[in-house]
């Protein structure tokens, strides 16, 4: 089974995953997030946690098209992005302060000499619409605890209060779709 972790950063999911990121990490197998080195219909699973929001909408369509190309029919795409809807609700209800959501919504990352920032936000409706427009089907919100990567603590497991996975509110929008 071919499983790709695209935008993995420093997180190493082990030998059963191919690690892809534009950064400079020892465990990387490839750097091209557009997966040009992969044959069409050759990948079973693409997972990307909190990388997709660094793209604007046009870049997102291009990337989804590239990922669609390499996924096998019935292949799975699993995306995790900051959940704009949940964070907005928490803020409007007075459950969190603006300072608590600035990082998740407007995050930044150092990529060598360059600093990159989030370029967009998503709620379930906007992300599922985008996925459907790019050819994906059967879009739904997945439960991170039920995945084969649940033991790897990444931002798909982001909660407010921070790390309160039992009583907190999940602020990551975790969506799965099929080719």
What is the role of each PLM region?
Residues 50-54:
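Short catalytic micro-motifs in class I SAM-dependent methyltransferases
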Residues 10-40, 143-144, 148-165:
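Adenosine-cofactor binding site in Rossmann-like domains, unifying the SAM/SAH pocket
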Residues 43-44:
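Local beta-strand N-terminus motif with an aromatic residue
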Residues 47:
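A conserved beta-strand element that flanks and buttresses the S-adenosyl-L-methionine
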Residues 59-66, 72, 76-178:
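S-adenosyl-L-methionine-dependent methyltransferase catalytic module, highlighting the catalytic core
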Residues 2, 16, 138:
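Residues at the starts of beta-strands that form the adenosine-phosphate
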Residues 2-9:
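Conserved class I S-adenosyl-L-methionine
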């Amino acid at each position: 089974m071919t499983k790709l972790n695209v935008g993995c950063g420093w997180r190493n999911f082990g030998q059963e995953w191919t690690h892809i990121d534009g950064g400079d990490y020892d465990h990387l197998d490839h750097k091209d997030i557009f997966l040009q080195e992969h044959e069409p219909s050759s990948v079973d699973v693409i997972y990307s946690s909190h990388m997709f929001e660094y793209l604007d909408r046009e870049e997102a369509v291009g990337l989804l098209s590239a990922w669609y190309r390499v996924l096998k029919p019935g292949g799975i795409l699993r995306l995790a992005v900051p959940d704009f809807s949940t964070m907005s609700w928490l803020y409007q209800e007075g459950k969190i302060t603006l300072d608590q959501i600035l990082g998740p919504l407007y995050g930044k990352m150092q990529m060598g000499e360059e600093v990159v920032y989030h370029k967009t936000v998503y709620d379930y409706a906007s992300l599922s619409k985008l996925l459907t427009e790019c050819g994906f089907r059967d879009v739904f919100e997945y439960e991170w605890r039920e995945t084969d990567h649940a033991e790897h603590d990444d931002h798909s497991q982001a909660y407010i209060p921070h790390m309160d996975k039992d009583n907190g509110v999940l602020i990551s929008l975790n969506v799965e779709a099929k080719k």
